Amino acid sequence: KDSRDINPVHDLILPFTRMVAGPMDYTPGAVNNATAEDFYINFVHPISLGTRAHQAALYVVYESSLQMLADSPSNYYKAPEFASFISRIPTTWDDTKAITAKIGEQLVIARKNGKNWYLAGLTDWNARSIEVKLNFLEADKYKMEVFKDGVNADVYASDFKTEEVIVSKGDSINVTMAKGGGWAAILTPIE
């Protein structure tokens, strides 16, 4: 927030370095987001590089049994959808599946807690769409609540979209991310 060095590329190096030995401490959850072109250092109202959805995805990607909110409490009151979504992401996991990853470039991971699955993707400064086959799911059908980059996230990094869809075990979905973006989902079995 006070350096250009803490950016989406950096975020995609940490799972391969600091997290190799186990959980790590980090401060995701920034509400003030900027593209590389719009970023400036602001000590009064800190800004993070990358999209709001990138920040949401970090809660699933980074393993930390004591997660935190990195921003001012006032900012979470102004962003209730974001605050509500990240508050539902657990801090411990029963299972983890690495779907795809390339250090410093992109990553998609699935984690399980109880009966729910949590899916997240991160990208560097390149927009990308990654096809993910949901063959790791156990139940037949799931409600998938998605927090993803909005259509304008490539120029306004705080733009996001939420949606709910029904998916089935074995379906293929596209994890589409803006430059510096992210994608996160909570999958709850339908019984």
Give residue ranges: language-model regions:
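Glycan-recognition surfaces
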Residues: 1-73, 99
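Glycan-recognition and catalytic regions of carbohydrate-active enzymes
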Residues: 71-118, 154-158
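Carbohydrate-binding surface patches
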Residues: 103-142, 183-184
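Solvent-exposed beta-strand/loop surfaces of large extracellular or lumenal domains
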Residues: 146-170
